[in-house]
From Swiss-Prot:
Gene behind this protein: nikA
Role according to the record: Involved in a nickel transport system, probably represents the nickel binder.
InterPro entries: CntA-like, Peptide/Ni-bd, SBP_5, SBP_5_CS, SBP_5_dom
Compartments (UniProt record): Periplasm
Name used for this protein in its record: Nickel-binding periplasmic protein
Keywords: Nickel, Periplasm, Signal, Transport
Cited CDD domains: PBP2_NikA
BP terms from Gene Ontology: negative chemotaxis; nickel cation import across plasma membrane; nickel cation transport; peptide transport
Organism: Escherichia coli (strain K12)
Length: 524
């Protein structure tokens, strides 16, 4: 699901990044921590979101200001009640194998996605679509249950509502795999070798503006230090990613070197811990509140993140739509944390440094992706901070798939988590809280008002009334904040390190995409 996404790009932008080496004016070599996967446009891990977006395209394209522009659809209209939408498709688009992209092909893709509707239930649009049909070669009609306000934005997402040539379905479906990743986008996956590389070439028959680059090779390089060394020795010309891009002390050093060009974007998403409200001892509000006061976030960011990110006080940054609510932050205050625990009956026995209640120690597991050195470093700092208030935090480092399984089934006390950035936040991120697709559903299971929160999420996605929408978002986000379900840590920015001759490197409006088509290598 999106988690894969997030941890895929966001452990793939977060757990790595990408590296680019200008082998020639029209060829670059990049690096990624894992292979890009089979590139099924309608499924999740191990498919890498940035690569899905290179090959497959949406009806409408998301922009940095939150709007959408025509893409495979050149125009659209909707009924007065907002439930029936008619899209007029471009008539000059073909899949990279020469098959025509038309309304029939688009409708078949929607059918394939919705035949696997339960898999996509985290995204409300998958639940809202009632019917999709081709009215003609160029007219596509989509009927919804209600006037769903994020409809166009969710059509623009990297997955699942993008289009593969119907000839590449397996047994008329995509839920069990595809034959080959044939899309309409500017890139074609030419070759993959497991644990070694993936090669993309420019789609020479692309209907839109062709990229300047003809070939991109993604070498599989999991280690950030190896990437940094490659850049420093001149083998790599560009690195682009999030906080896992390269060792952050190295980024800080590169930033001081006039021979290198470095960039930090505006904050794009939040890294936090999800606290399990249904599992002792984090089922107690006082414990969750105390843990929020226990972590010295500024020190953590200065030491583990080398000051490259911003302290997070709330689930979403105030810059996120509907999230600038003035919620009171739980700023670092270990004495207040201790007082909360004392009042809740968690006392410190003589001669011990771990609190107990009814003979049980205040012991909490913190789960993280074991191969992510940055998460490990952050976990160790959090562990030390929480020990200062008498909490014994045991660290559970496991492979990525195991951590996501823990998120889905609730086998965690605390677990690293993050929001998804534009265009998912806040609406799609909140929508997913209603199903066990990510850590949020399980983390909230112990809340008495969980049914109300879920009900209000459904209402906020369907209402026409902007005043009601604002009020619902305020209530949902305030409840989650007051219940201390999350321990926000930092607001994450995208990072770029490049040779100055590449100029200013653009950021994609969708955080999980990489704008390779806008990169124009320049000869020295």
């Amino acid at each position: 699901m999106l988690s894969t996404l997030r941890r895929t790009l966001f452990a793939l932008l977060a757990c790595a990044s990408f590296i680019v080496h200008a082998a020639a004016p029209d060829e670059i070599t990049t690096a990624w921590p894992v292979n890009v996967g089979p590139l099924n446009p309608h499924l999740y891990t191990p498919n890498q979101m940035f690569a899905q977006s290179m090959v497959y395209e949406p009806l409408v394209k998301y922009q940095a200001d939150g709007s959408v522009i025509p893409w495979l659809a050149k125009s659209w209209t909707h009924s007065e009640d907002g439930k029936t939408w008619t899209f007029t498709l471009r008539d000059d688009v073909k899949f990279s194998n020469g098959e025509p992209f038309d309304a029939e092909a688009a409708a078949e893709n929607f059918r394939a996605v919705l035949d696997n509707r339960q898999r996509h239930a985290w995204l409300e649009l998958a639940n809202q679509i009632v019917d999709v049909k081709a009215l003609s070669k160029t007219e596509l009609q989509i009927t919804l249950k209600s006037a769903y306000y994020p409809f166009l934005q969710e059509l623009a997402l990297p997955r699942p509502f993008r289009f593969i040539a119907p000839s590449q379905f397996k047994n008329h479906e995509t839920m069990n795999g595809i034959k080959a990743p044939i899309g309409t986008g500017p890139w074609i996956l030419q070759e993959s070798k497991l644990n070694q590389y993936d090669v993309f070439v420019r789609n020479e028959n692309y209907w839109g503006e062709k990229p300047a680059i003809k070939k991109i090779t993604f070498n599989v390089i999991p280690d950030p230090t190896t990437r940094a060394v490659a850049f420093e020795t001149g083998d790599i010309d560009l690195l682009y990613g999030n906080e896992g891009l390269l060792p952050l002390d190295t980024f800080a050093r590169f930033s001081q070197n006039p021979a290198y060009h470095t960039q930090l974007s505006q904050p794009i998403e939040t890294v936090m811990l999800a606290l399990n409200t249904a599992k002792a001892p984090t089922n107690e509000l006082a414990v969750r509140e105390a843990l929020n006061y226990a972590v010295n976030k500024k020190s953590l960011i200065d030491n583990a993140l080398y000051g490259t990110q911003q302290v997070a006080d709330t689930l979403f940054a105030p810059s996120v739509p509907y999230a600038n609510l003035g919620l009171k932050p739980s700023q670092y205050d270990p004495q207040k944390a201790k007082a909360l625990l004392e009042k809740a009956g968690w006392t410190l026995p003589a001669g011990k440094d771990i609190r107990e209640k009814n003979g049980q120690p205040l012991r909490i597991e913190l789960s993280f992706i074991g191969t992510d050195a940055l998460s490990k470093s952050m976990a160790e700092i959090i562990q030390a901070d929480m020990r200062q208030i008498g909490a014994d935090v045991s660290l559970i480092g496991e492979e990525e798939s195991s951590i996501y399984a823990r998120q889905r089934d609730g086998r965690f006390g605390m677990i690293f988590h993050r929001t998804w950035g534009a265009p998912y936040d806040p609406h799609a991120f909140l929508s997913s809280m209603r199903v066990p697709s990510h850590a949020d559903f399980q983390a909230q299971q112990g809340l008495a008002d969980k049914p109300l929160i879920d009900k209000e999420i459904g209402e906020v996605l369907a209402t026409h009334d902007e005043t009601q929408r604002q009020a619902l978002y305020r209530d949902i986000l305030t409840r989650l904040h007051d219940e201390a379900v999350y321990l926000p840590i930092s607001y994450i920015s995208m990072m770029v390190v490049s040779k100055p001759e590449l100029g200013n490197i653009p950021y994609a409006p969708i955080a999980t995409e990489i704008p390779f088509e806008q990169i124009k290598p320049v000869k020295p």
